[in-house]
């Protein structure tokens, strides 16, 4: 658990010096801080002060003032010399930079025990970075597509002296020392690298925050003709297929658009996903296989019973674009996402790889449906129209025989062969490739 340091001061003299306390969670959600079993604490005298700080430091020599009565004064040297990490991009480094302090009050318990209560306050200050929202207004002449609102605009801090922590889509945080500040800048780019920003996060009051709104955190409207071959980045940004990508954009590309608009044969309902409405804006295919070569191959699921994804898609592929809907039915048959697994038929391995494993390797944009196992109609369309999306600036890994989410019989599910074209069906215990798609 988390660790903090405790001081007990009697008559201006430190009686207990930097005692390590470790947090344990209680059933009611509260937290109890306990010393190790060998450490016995005695207190409760009228002339005692109790001070706590977090996170624990092994070297506290010369960093406290035993004559002080308030935590700000007691820990003044610790606070002034505290150096928040330059790289706070992970939660661990962000939390380790957030110095907190407290003084304690005592409550007498049974059998002569004494409980200490602390209310922690932040000794540092917080810079909050808000990114703009980009609204893609689609200009397609042949299909009407509603605006695509990307609230998760990501910043690229690759070359920044200071690296903030992404607390939520489009929002970042950085811990700053209010006593001595920083002379370094937070610099970044967004909008696929086309826009830049910079600021120095100096905040003078402890336990306070300042919001930095990049370009006013405004809503930026952007005209875009959505077409197969467009690039969908990890933050939900779209880049047209005719634009030249930077190396950073290539690395951030998670999927390629293969269809613009909501297909009329898609009976999926998307309001509970990141899309937030019934109909999607388009569909995109993952850059990489869900099961890497050469170990590729997963069972579809349980033989001898339908999960409800059979359709006319085998003979009429264009009528079945229900990949997301079918994937949810398979998940229900497994007993929930947590019951999917890679090894047993009851765990529906193909769906596990499409939904769980691929998400672990390549996070879907926040404003999307999330990854799912495509239906036969979606896989058929991908194959038939591969020249429109397959040969762009980002290399796509897709070759071989792939499962779809569409059933054929109770024992069989439909596959699509990329390379030498072939649409077929096999028993669900057979092992084939898995390639994820998403709607956005």
Feature names for model-found ranges:
Residues 1-126, 130-134, 178, 210-214:
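Short, low-hydrophobicity acidic/polar segments
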Residues 14-30, 151-167, 199-202:
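Solvent-exposed serine/threonine-rich low-complexity stretches and specific carbohydrate-binding patches
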Residues 51-53, 126-130, 175, 284-286, ...:
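Residues within well-ordered beta-strands of beta-sheet-rich folds
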Residues 101-174, 182:
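Short helix-loop boundary/capping segments
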Residues 159-209:
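Accessory, usually C-terminal, subdomains that scaffold auxiliary metal cofactors
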Residues 189, 204-206, 210-367, 428-439:
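Short, compositionally biased
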Residues 369-370, 376-440:
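C-terminal, surface-exposed recognition/capping segments
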């Amino acid at each position: 658990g988390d660790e903090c340091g405790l001081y007990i001061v009697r008559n201006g003299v430190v009686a207990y010096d930097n005692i390590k306390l470790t947090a344990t969670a209680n059933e009611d959600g509260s937290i109890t801080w306990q010393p190790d079993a060998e450490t016995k604490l005695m207190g409760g005298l009228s002339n005692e002060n109790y001070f706590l700080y977090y996170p624990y430091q092994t070297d506290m020599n010369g960093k406290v003032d035993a004559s002080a009565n308030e935590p700000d004064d007691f820990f003044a040297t610790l606070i002034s010399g505290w150096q928040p990490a330059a790289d706070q991009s992970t939660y661990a480094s962000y939390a380790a930079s957030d110095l907190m302090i407290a003084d304690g009050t005592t409550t007498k318990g049974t059998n002569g025990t004494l409980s200490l209560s602390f209310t922690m306050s932040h000794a540092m200050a917080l810079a909050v970075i808000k990114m703009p929202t980009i609204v893609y207004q689609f200009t397609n002449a042949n299909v009407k597509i509603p605006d695509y609102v990307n609230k998760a605009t990501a910043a690229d801090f690759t070359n920044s002296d200071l690296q903030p922590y992404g607390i939520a889509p489009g929002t970042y945080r950085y811990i700053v020392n209010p006593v001595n500040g920083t002379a370094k800048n937070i610099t970044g780019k967004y909008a696929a690298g086309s826009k830049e920003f910079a600021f120095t996060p100096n905040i003078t009051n402890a336990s306070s925050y300042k919001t930095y709104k990049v370009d006013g955190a405004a809503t930026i409207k952007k005209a875009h003709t959505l077409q197969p071959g467009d690039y969908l980045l990890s933050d939900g940004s779209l880049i047209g297929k005719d634009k030249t990508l930077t190396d950073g954009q290539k690395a951030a590309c998670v999927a390629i658009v293969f269809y613009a608009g909501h297909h009329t044969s898609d009976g999926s309902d998307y309001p509970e996903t990141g899309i937030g409405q019934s109909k999607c804006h388009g569909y995109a295919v993952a850059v990489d296989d869900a099961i890497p070569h050469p170990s590729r191959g997963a069972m579809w699921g349980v033989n001898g019973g339908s999960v409800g994804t059979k359709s006319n898609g085998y003979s009429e592929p264009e009528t079945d674009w229900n990949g997301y809907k079918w994937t949810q039915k398979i998940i229900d048959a497994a007993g929930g996402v947590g019951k999917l697994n890679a090894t047993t038929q009851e765990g529906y391995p193909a769906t596990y790889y499409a939904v769980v494993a691929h998400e672990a390797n390549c996070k879907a944009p926040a404003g999307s449906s999330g990854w799912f196992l495509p239906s036969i109609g979606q896989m058929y369309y991908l194959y038939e129209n591969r020249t429109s999306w397959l040969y762009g600036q980002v290399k796509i890994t897709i070759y071989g025989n792939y499962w779809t989410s569409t059933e054929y019989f109770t024992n069989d599910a439909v596959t699509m062969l990329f390379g030498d074209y072939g649409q077929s069906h096999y028993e669900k215990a057979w092992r084939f490739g898995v390639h994820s798609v998403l709607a956005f």
